[in-house]
Regions:
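Elongated, acidic membrane-bridging lipid-handling scaffolds
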Residues: 90, 99-206, 313-352
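Hydrophobic residues on conserved beta-strands that form the core of alpha/beta folds
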Residues: 52-53, 67, 83, 107, ...
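Solvent-exposed loop/turn tips at the surfaces of repeat/solenoid architectures
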Residues: 70, 83-86, 110-115, 132, ...
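Terminal hydrophobic membrane-targeting helix
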Residues: 22-110, 550
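Solvent-exposed beta-strand/coil patches in large extracellular/periplasmic or lumenal scaffold regions
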Residues: 101-104, 112, 145, 236-264, ...
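Amphipathic hydrophobic-ligand
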Residues: 49-50, 76-90, 123-134, 157-165, ...
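Flexible, surface-exposed loop regions and adjacent strand-edge segments
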Residues: 126, 224-230, 303-306, 452-458
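Hydrophobic membrane-insertion alpha-helices, especially the h-region
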Residues: 10-25
Length: 578
């Protein structure tokens, strides 16, 4: 639309000079329609094919001319359209500019009524804007304020409107020296943005403040997805998630110097403070993100309710990904809640340079322990690669196991691992995963099943006796458990794990499918003495110092299913009693 107005002003300027000189004398006596050929010819010289199909009328208050039923097409075919009326008025104060060759245009008002514009976009379908109404009053480029208002209908019934008070000053070379946009009000359907913007020092310095009242982000994303089908609005567990978004930001930008941005983003009533410092001279970007509390329950995807939807945090990393120099982002969150889990005192430090991003630290307190992560993402090659080092220390398993139904564990978890992978989508990344780790659980306890009781019952069965009636504990208390871990693709293997229950050793291996969360556990039980423990049962000498394998399988969070190896049971039952 701006291009069209510039061309129209350029093409109609000779006509305006002619009209102004005789307008007072001849406005009532001369029919303005006689100037149609001159108007259309002047427009053609400016690269506009113009056809005025309606009447042309003089305007006295303010002084100007109105063209009705106007059709136009740019010679390069990039824009075409029509308008019910195009009205241009003259400013008497700048009338002398026609003679003095002053750069100030003598036009004071422009009004467009009910216009329709068809824009040709390269490699895409044309875009039509309709119901365009534009009014610009008291136009000048000498630093005096003037106003504009516009409203239009974009494709897919998107209603756009805007108004503001403008101030523009040009230097002697007709380049912008300063500008201001005050009382800005921009509306796109239900989204309303207000604020001001000021530019100075030849537009090298730009300051301002912008804010948006509460709006529905999901609804806005659905509108955008009509134009960009690849962008799909997320579907979350809580239908009200991301429906109450607001922001306010202040910025002080120096295009070739040091800039700052301070903003507050409210996501469904949860405030996130974001501050940025931009050093253009040294090509450095620093961003700090902080929040008191974030609850992520409602932001889980409907297709995967166990994790937060990445759309919530992905935009925060965009500046670092696009920055052309060194970048750093620090994260401070006092408390992060996901279901019954609470992660506190979260700190993160991410550094980027030349498409290599290093996570030097991501830590937080979790179930009386601490989690620490570090890693690197290399995006310099066609196939991105990454590595992650993690450590978990002193996690209270009794509290952590409450996150899962039918899973009751106790003890203190310590864990360390290194994982590497590469790929350009979720599937290729999963298939490339490789890593190893060490697991230590101090004083592990499994609640709801007593393995010693199971062992004693099996021993009684092997000896041909009924199991003794005892007041067994409902839990299994083990000695410290250690294990080695190996990751290949979506399969996590636990090898060389071992622990002890009284006079009985447990060791073996297991595997977990990370996609289905189904596990297989192969455990070997070895009784080293003839009693399971000082308070336990007598073990048949037949199975003392003899390995007894158990096979367990199931899904995480499901019922624990574990039984001795059938072939060994048959062998023991058929063996002669000692």
């Amino acid at each position: 639309m701006n291009t069209l107005l510039k061309l129209l002003l350029k093409g109609l300027l000779p006509l305006i000079a002619f009209v102004v000189l005789g307008l007072f004398i001849a406005s009532l006596a001369i029919d303005a329609n006689r100037f149609k050929p001159e108007i259309e010819s002047a427009a053609a010289s400016a690269g506009i094919e113009l056809a005025v199909e309606g009447d042309i009328a003089w305007q006295l208050l303010p002084l100007g001319i109105a063209l009705n039923q106007v059709n136009f097409t740019l010679n390069n075919k990039s824009m075409a359209g029509n308008a019910d009326q195009l009205a241009i008025s003259v400013n008497f104060k700048t009338l002398a500019s026609l003679i003095s060759q002053s750069p100030q245009l003598p036009i004071s008002h422009i009004k467009v009524k009910n216009s329709r514009v068809l824009l040709a976009i390269p490699n895409s379908l044309p875009v039509q804007l309709s119901q365009i109404n534009l009014a610009v009053d008291n136009i000048n480029t000498q630093g005096q304020p003037f106003t504009y208002s516009i409203d239009l209908l974009a494709p897919y019934s998107v209603r756009i409107s805007s108004s503001a008070a403008l101030n523009i000053a040009l230097n002697d070379q007709q380049q912008p020296e300063s500008f201001s946009v005050n009382n800005l009000d921009l509306s796109i359907n239900d989204l309303s943005i207000k604020g001001y913007v000021e530019g100075s020092e030849g537009l090298n310095k730009i300051q301002g403040q912008l804010s948006a009242d509460s709006f529905d982000l999901i609804k806005q994303l659905k509108v955008v997805s009509r134009f960009i089908p690849e962008l799909e609005a997320p579907r979350m567990v809580d239908p009200k998630a991301l429906t109450d978004i607001a922001f306010e930001g202040f910025f002080d930008l120096v295009l070739d110097g040091f800039s700052t941005i301070q903003s507050t983003l409210s996501i469904d009533g949860q405030a996130i403070e974001i501050s940025s410092e931009i050093d253009q001279e040294n090509l450095k970007l620093y961003t700090a993100i902080s929040a008191n509390q974030l609850k992520l329950d409602g932001y889980a995807s409907q297709s995967n309710s166990g994790s937060a939807n990445p759309v919530l945090f992905a935009p925060l990393a965009i500046p670092m990904a696009l920055w052309h120099g060194q970048s750093q982002m620090e994260l401070n969150i006092a408390e992060l809640n996901i279901g019954a889990a609470s992660l506190t005192n979260i700190y993160g430090n991410l550094i980027g340079n030349q498409n290599i991003f290093r996570l030097s630290s991501l830590s937080g307190d979790f179930f009386d322990g601490q989690i620490n992560l570090s890693g690197e993402l290399n995006m310099q090659s066609r196939t991105p690669s990454f590595s992650v080092d993690s450590s978990v220390s002193n996690i209270d398993l009794n509290r952590a196991s409450q996150l899962f139904d039918d899973l009751n564990l106790g003890g203190e978890l310590n864990f360390s691992s290194n994982i590497k992978g590469s790929g350009y989508d979720g599937y290729s990344v999963m298939q490339s995963l490789a890593g190893s780790g060490q697991l230590v659980i101090n004083s592990p306890r499994y609640q709801g099943i007593n393995l010693e009781q199971t062992l004693c019952n099996a021993a009684a069965l092997f000896s041909g006796k009924m199991p003794a009636v005892k007041d067994w504990s409902e839990d299994t208390q083990l000695d410290d458990l250690t294990a080695s871990l190996s990751l290949r693709g979506n399969s996590l293997s636990v090898t060389e794990y071992s622990t002890q229950l009284g006079n009985v050793d447990f060791y073996g291996s297991s595997s977990l499918n990370l996609s289905s969360l189904r596990y297989k556990l192969n455990a070997t039980v070895l009784a080293t003495q003839e009693r399971s423990s000082s308070m336990g049962c007598t073990i048949n000498p037949m199975i003392v110092e003899r390995e007894i394998p158990f096979k367990c399988k199931g899904a995480v969070g499901g019922t624990f299913n574990c039984k001795p190896d059938n072939s060994l049971i048959k062998t023991l039952l058929l063996s002669p009693k000692l």
